[in-house]
Design a protein with these regions (language model features):
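Structural core segment of the AMP-binding/adenylate-forming
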Residues: 10, 52, 79-146, 444
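Conserved AMP-binding/adenylation subdomain of ANL enzymes
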Residues: 189-209, 213-292, 298-301
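Conserved AMP-binding A3 loop
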Residues: 32-36, 166-192
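Gly/Ser/Thr-rich phosphate-binding loop
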Residues: 252-256, 266-347, 360, 444
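ANL superfamily adenylate-forming
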Residues: 114-162, 268-296
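Conserved pre-ATP/AMP-binding loop-to-beta segment of ANL
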Residues: 17-20, 131, 151-170, 177, ...
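Conserved AMP-binding/adenylate-forming core of the ANL superfamily
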Residues: 21-75, 92-97, 143-146, 185-186
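Conserved ATP-binding/catalytic segment of the ANL
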Residues: 355-422, 427, 439
Length: 448
């Protein structure tokens, strides 16, 4: 039975050594990494970790845009028994300062990142900087190539276990200081197995990596799913090349928050000249126009398109339906990924769907969604009080208010802490009101 990331990496290296796992693009050129090449790089860096640190459990930071060496750095630290702390390339200096200090970070992998000028000013004393290939740092640092070269062909001695702590994913949620959500091999792989079953992912499926890997959704749904399903990941060069890179991948699965789907919508409308022109084209040849748009976007091979992380305006979903592009809604959070998703065979627009297999769901007297399932986080790093508030008797208190319709479909109605009382003493949920305004394409953000 495969219970760790390294189990999957070893399996695909053994069965499909020459199959491409990762594809990077730079302009008109591409760089491919097969399973055997990735396996060699990951294990070489894991061996360097073992040569450098006498004990496991060191905090290892990762600050870079999405690229193959993000995966290599991540999995090498896990393979050596250390704890990866991914950080956003847009995070302000004070946030990265807090995360590095709070976790007692010993190593920081540095790739291309737009916030380096801020981060370098708050680096902890004695931290080891490792520059990923192609990155030059003015500060004293080590180079990836120099570290792995002596160990290529070697294997680390450490044997990963399913309950090993492999990552701290920091999230501030809606209030308070950032909390480090603890993730183990199991708390990553069990939800990924649910995704794979629910989305009917096939072995060798293609994935498109463009959202920040510091976010749990990108890390599990793309990196993790590709590892579990022997998939092929295409990295987006940058957001300005999204419409070029996506058709070159033609993914089987894609995840995006509503804002991404809105931006793609605006791009389509701009190509036609106006929404009226879109309507006229669809009226004249709905099937032909739909096929053309699916192919142009690179979504013609997509088996499952997920929109989540924020409320999706129903009008946006209906708009995509006209092109034969079916957006599915779902719910998850860093503490418990993917417990509720929509399914193609039964979709209700506006609903996040129904609980996935082996997931228990309960609604509290305050209408808060509670989730119990294998694969949830064990809690918050070094925050026992916050852990006790959220994880109670095996139930994760999500902080989201829900309602359930007569057919068992779940709907998010707002956050527990967002409700406020008017001067007349009436409780008001701002989210449904805000959602009405966000259906207007000229509205980007709104707050009541």
């Amino acid at each position: 039975m495969l219970t760790t990331y390294t189990d999957y990496l070893n399996q695909w290296n053994s069965q499909y050594p020459d199959q491409v796992w990762l594809r990077e693009r730079s302009g008109d050129s591409t760089t491919d990494w097969t399973w055997s090449q990735a396996h060699r790089e990951i294990n070489a860096m894991a061996c360097w970790f073992e040569s450098r640190f006498a004990t496991t459990g060191q905090s290892v930071g990762l600050l870079s845009r999405n690229r193959a060496h993000w995966y290599f750095a991540d999995l090498s630290a896990c393979a050596a028994g250390h704890v990866v702390v991914p950080m956003f390339t847009t995070a302000p200096g004070e946030t990265t300062d807090y995360v590095m200090s709070f976790t007692d970070m010993k190593v920081l992998f540095v790739g291309e990142t737009e916030n380096w000028d801020q981060v370098r000013q708050v680096l902890p004393e004695g931290i080891l900087l490792i520059a990923l290939p192609g990155v030059d740092l003015a500060q004293e640092h080590l180079r990836w190539e120099d570290l792995v070269a002596p160990f290529r062909g070697s294997m680390p001695a450490y044997q990963c276990q399913a309950d090993d702590l492999v990552s701290l994913v920091f999230t501030s949620g809606t209030t308070g200081v950032p909390k480090g959500v603890m993730q183990t091999h199991s708390s990553n792989l069990i939800p990924i197995a649910r995704f794979s079953s629910t989305f009917s992912m096939a072995v060798g499926a293609k994935f498109f990596s463009y959202l920040p890997l510091a976010h749990i959704a990108e890390r599990q749904l793309i990196e993790g799913s590709s590892l579990v399903n022997c998939g092929e990941v295409h990295f987006n060069e940058n957001l300005t090349t999204l419409l070029r890179d996506l058709p070159l991948c033609r993914p089987a699965f894609m995840f995006g928050p509503p804002r991404v789907w809105e931006q793609l919508q605006q791009g389509i409308i701009a190509q036609f000249g106006s929404q009226d022109a879109v309507d006229a084209a669809l009226e004249a040849d709905a099937e032909g126009v739909g096929k053309m748009i699916r192919e142009k976007l690179g979504l013609d091979q997509a088996q499952y398109l997920l929109t989540a992380a924020a409320p999706t305006p129903p009008a946006l979903i209906h708009w995509y339906d006209r092109f034969g592009i079916c957006l599915m809604e779902g719910f998850g959070q860093t503490e418990c990924m993917g417990p509720i998703v929509s399914r193609k065979e039964e979709r209700r627009i506006g609903s996040i769907g129904k609980p996935t297999e082996d997931v228990e769901v309960r609604v509290s007297d305050e209408d808060e969604l509670l989730v119990k399932a294998a694969g949830c986080s064990p809690g918050y790093y070094n925050m026992p009080e916050k852990t006790a508030e959220t994880f109670i008797d095996g139930w994760v208190h999500t902080g989201d208010k829900v309602r359930i319709d007569e057919d068992g479909f779940y709907y998010i109605t707002g956050r527990v802490k967002d409700y406020f009382k008017t001067i007349q003493g009436k409780f008001v949920a701002p989210t449904p009101i805000e959602n009405i305004f966000t259906e207007n394409p000229y509205t980007e953000q709104i707050c009541l």
